[in-house]
A protein has these predicted regions:
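N-terminal, polar/charged subdomain of small-to-medium soluble alpha/beta proteins
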Residues: 1-106
Length: 106
């Protein structure tokens, strides 16, 4: 599985890269056919509300795209949320495939 991490208005440091790769890398245990995950991390500055960190993920598997967004005041929390939502979506997709395959075996 290829993980591509990019930053928008944010420098991707080695600790951020390693943390993101660790979190996103866990998806492999739920679904083997993930080809690539593109993660874009960004920050929006606000004088009144503080910084808002965004994590956008686009997962490619078996000709399917799964797109997820997460926002939080903390970058690492946004990455955690992105990983959790991607995990749920991958599980849901995998169940959908299982159900589809079961229906076709009658």
């Amino acid at each position: 599985m290829k993980i591509i991490i990019s930053g928008k208005h944010l420098k991707i440091t080695e600790p951020i890269k390693e943390y993101t790769e660790e979190k996103i890398g866990r998806l492999k245990k739920y679904f083997d056919n993930i080809l690539e995950v593109d993660v874009t991390l960004s920050v929006e500055h606000s004088k009144t509300e503080g910084d808002l960190h965004k994590a956008d993920g686009l997962l490619f598997a078996n000709g399917t795209k799964i797109r997820v967004e997460a926002e939080n005041n903390d970058l690492y929390a946004a990455i955690d949320e992105l990983s959790d939502v991607l995990e749920r979506q991958v599980r849901k997709y995998k169940e959908k495939l299982k159900d589809h395959n079961k229906k076709g075996t009658h």
